[in-house]
Amino acid sequence: MKLFPSTSTHASARSERSLKSKMAHICLSATFPLLLLGGGSVGAAEVLENSSSISSESAVANSNITLAAGDLYVSPNGSANNPGTINSPTSLANALTQIAPGKTIYLRGGTYSFSETITIERGNNGTSSQRKNLVAYGSEKPVFDFSAQSFASTNRGLQMFGDYWFVKGLEVKGAGDNGIFIGGSYNRLEQIEAHHNRDTGIQIGRYASTAAKSEWPSYNEVIRSYSHNNYDPDDGEDADGFAAKLTVGPGNVFDGCIAAYNVDDGWDLYSKSDTGAIGVVTIRNSIAFANGATADGTSTSNSDGNGFKLGGEKISVNHIVENSIAFNNKKHGFTYNSNPGSIQMKNNTSWNNGQSNFAFDKGTHIFTNNLSFQGGASDKTSGTDVSSTNVWWKNKKSVNDKGLLASAADFVSLVPSVTRSADGTPILGDFLRLANGSDLIGSGTPSGTNVGAR
């Protein structure tokens, strides 16, 4: 399926709201390929040549399912009075309170229409060795539709306040605020599609304003998921693709994800002076494009449009971004957003963003093997250029300190094409892939490593 029609640093700290549709629906299934921008579907080529392999420790296989004692089936028409068998499925609300650690709730396909938030309550936990599992049954596609909710900061879709849950294969749309909000720790989400929600598609943040900093959500993983066309109708300033901001602990990871057509930013890692520094977030093997407007062109003067926004309010946090790509975003591709710390930027590619591909005006950031081409403004790169391995867009040229020059000839294709494989892995085909004979191949560090993500 096609993913791409085509394409201000703000205090996105909408104080302690879960942070907040009217877009053309672009269906990007977590289980089917999706296509982008005018390119046809492409084969299962690897997205990011330099990528560390995307984590894939699925707790539950999606084929050859054998129902174990204690597992439960849920369907759109399930009843709390039913036992939760395949022939007599229970309701989701009932299953969430009944499932034991190590057991699985299988979601049958179809549309689950909700007018109220679904909450996995605090204390409803799995364990490190026995997660609680909430997964699509086989190849079926469960869709959680919260369109009946009104726009309000309390009207999230799925709230996860428990620990050690594994959630896979859901589509979540139309929520009055966040599509999915993670307030617990040690949770893992895979192959989620969040779209047309009225705030950020998938956000991590504290479960309540009374939570101590030691209770801030930590060590959550969002894997091979896609968040798009999220739009907050009050001012268009809050709805990002993914966010780990304001009140998150250490160890949260986004791996192999795509954020596109969100009215504000692709990723938002905002820190706020009221609550202090958040924990270090790692983003790898991920893509942000065409953020700052929805697919039908809906935007506001407040819509920032950064691909990866990595800070806020001059607070230092040493985030990590690796093997990721930003292109065609309204504003910057990657921005420090006033974070003066030592963000580690390694093997990223940024192309054709509205302003700077890399905007790191101040700080002691660490840059290794990054590639910038054809930005709207010159890059700003305060920090260390490790072994002079970065190629920056400066004065309308891509250059580096060792004399490398990048041109269109260094790429196999500059025609955007983005799809997802059956397991949600992003695929770019030849887009931004280094061409044979390019001087950028093998010019990074360690010796033999390519410059850029591909």
Regions flagged by a language model, labelled:
Residues 71, 75-108, 113-114, 119, ...:
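Acidic Gly/Asp/Thr-rich repetitive segments characteristic of extracellular carbohydrate-active
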Residues 72, 105, 132, 142, ...:
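Solenoid scaffold repeats with emphasis on beta-solenoid/beta-helix
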Residues 80, 129, 363-454:
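Acidic, glycine- and Ser/Thr-rich low-complexity intrinsically disordered tracts
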Residues 87, 106-109, 125-176, 231:
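Right-handed parallel beta-helix/beta-spiral solenoid domain characteristic of secreted/periplasmic
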Residues 93-98, 113-124, 144-147, 184, ...:
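Short, T/G/N/S-enriched strand-turn elements that build extracellular solenoid repeat scaffolds
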Residues 108, 121, 135-137, 145, ...:
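Feature marks extracellular polysaccharide-active and adherence modules
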Residues 115-122, 146-158, 174-181, 196-217, ...:
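Extracellular beta-strand/beta-solenoid scaffold signature
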Residues 191, 285, 299, 312-409:
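Extracellular beta-rich repeat passengers
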